[in-house]
């Protein structure tokens, strides 16, 4: 089928020698800015018109600019599955089944892209868009389940985050398609929750903004637009993104990846040169992500989706709702956790709220099961190439190693209160930043190269030095001499020295005054209770905490017990009945629409739908 837009772009690519992938993606990323200038001026109450505009522009991107008919089919299949199963399947397993289908569909396309799809200069892979969509669809299923399929008593037990993201009624099909195919984030993200999208679409998120901050309508005197002006900030994001894009192109030209694969050239250079060359490769490879995420964030800011509240004290507007990268923190982070929290931030949130906390049994803290599922989901979501798994597995070990060093070294450079830094902490911070950059430059090489043998060859060219350091650290702090090593570092920590002196003093007082000793004993017991840290997910790459993996057997026994209990309650038969009812509801709604007037068809597609809470029988 003839595509006039593709024909023009192909001619430009041929005549000027421009890279097809770069040109088409640049048009989609930068083209969203003039489109958003139009979108934000559509009257607030014309929700249907906004949705039609969003979907139309996405279709123009997919069919016209990218020439991805099969790509649209891929995205549409996942989107409609989530829409239909969440609308008709009333079961506590609905979010789980949706997650399995969406991630399974993504896995099939990852495998197809790796083994069967022949990439040419005129084709663009759709899996990156599907990765963004997978986050949207799986989080929507959980949000809808929380808001519409739980009883009032169960809703009260949800966390504040779950309550704030809960979707009370099933959205109209048009609005859901606009959410799934939002053109500004279609290709590179960031992902965002349906609750945020709906609040933006209805302009409810701007309710806290003073009227004086809302611009006047040019053609309607006396009326104000809900979305505040933000053109300068959006333009600044574009400038930053273009700068990162240029730096990425120049960097890859002067520091090519193929040089580290040169068996005759790269290994002959000094070890110091090699480890710093790997650092530069990792640094330059991040530029393209900085470019894409910064530009897409600017696009979301321009249309108003990036609005995150008004600060009445500073009288400034926050525009970081969909922020996906904190570049400064990534490049100056003093520890692994800090760096990972600032990288791909919305994916981190998705892993935490849609995987890590969801697989945790109610009433228990996250443990082995949560860590394992999050690790596998994070790696599998990226793809099936061996390089991803090498990077994630090494990263997990390195993050654990980093926590060990931070726990033992950092307190040495803090005063007795454990907070105020000593003058020498600046040296600790600089060494930490330098070590993290070198380590990440080493770890991300398989992520860049992707294939197994070349990745191992590059690591071998620097003698697997990060792996050796990690292994030695585990031996030192987890091996037979762990107690002595830990005790040595504690003896150098000002806070620990102060605590030991304090305890000795309290012990002496307790011996001389029994009554006062009882009070001091109660105080010590109280402080022990306060030191227990809340179980938190390590964003990005879950660490391999060996002591926490000891409860794997307990988790497995709990799972077997739950499954046996579910089976004894005829769980399989109940779910078969739920699926049958879902199909009957589906047929009933469409048969009613087909036999009714055009208004009934319109109502089916454009009105909300909210089922009753799931009954005990349906569970």
From Swiss-Prot:
Pfam families: MBOAT. Changing residue 297 to L: Abolishes catalytic activity. It is found in: Endoplasmic reticulum membrane. InterPro entries: LPLAT_7/PORCN-like, MBOAT_fam. Disulfide bonds: none annotated. The active site is at residues 146, 297, 382. Optimum pH is 6.5-7.5. GO terms for biological process: glycerophospholipid biosynthetic process; lipid modification; phosphatidylcholine acyl-chain remodeling; phosphatidylcholine biosynthesis from sn-glycero-3-phosphocholine; phosphatidylethanolamine biosynthetic process. It catalyses: a 1-acyl-sn-glycero-3-phosphate + an acyl-CoA = a 1,2-diacyl-sn-glycero-3-phosphate + CoA; a 1-acyl-sn-glycero-3-phosphocholine + an acyl-CoA = a 1,2-diacyl-sn-glycero-3-phosphocholine + CoA; 1-acyl-sn-glycero-3-phospho-(1'-sn-glycerol) + an acyl-CoA = a 1,2-diacyl-sn-glycero-3-phospho-(1'-sn-glycerol) + CoA; a 1-acyl-sn-glycero-3-phospho-(1D-myo-inositol) + an acyl-CoA = a 1,2-diacyl-sn-glycero-3-phospho-(1D-myo-inositol) + CoA. The chain crosses the membrane at residues 20-39, 52-72, 93-113, 232-252, 275-295, 430-450, 457-477. Residues 40-51, 114-231, 296-429, 478-619 are cytoplasmic. GO terms for molecular function: 1-acylglycerol-3-phosphate O-acyltransferase activity; 1-acylglycerophosphocholine O-acyltransferase activity; 1-acylglycerophosphoethanolamine O-acyltransferase activity; 1-acylglycerophosphoserine O-acyltransferase activity; lysophosphatidylethanolamine acyltransferase activity; O-acyltransferase activity. Its EC number is 2.3.1.23, 2.3.1.51, 2.3.1.n6, 2.3.1.n7. Residues 1-19, 73-92, 253-274, 451-456 are lumenal. Its main location: endoplasmic reticulum. It is a multi-pass membrane protein. Keywords: Acyltransferase, Coiled coil, Endoplasmic reticulum, Lipid biosynthesis, Lipid metabolism, Membrane, Phospholipid biosynthesis, Phospholipid metabolism, Phosphoprotein, Transferase, Transmembrane, Transmembrane helix. The modification Phosphoserine is found at residues 513, 605, 610, 615. It is an enzyme of class 2 (transferase). Belongs to the membrane-bound acyltransferase family. Broad specificity membrane-bound O-acyltransferase that mediates the incorporation of unsaturated acyl chains into the sn-2 position of various lysophospholipids. Preferentially acylates lysophosphocholine (LPC), but also lysophosphoethanolamine (LPE), lysophosphatidylglycerol (LPG), lysophosphatidic acid (LPA), lysophosphoethanolamine (LPE), lysophosphoinositol (LPI), and lysophosphoserine (LPS). Prefers an acyl residue to an alkyl residue at the sn-1 position of lysophospholipid acceptors. This is Lysophospholipid acyltransferase. The gene is ALE1.
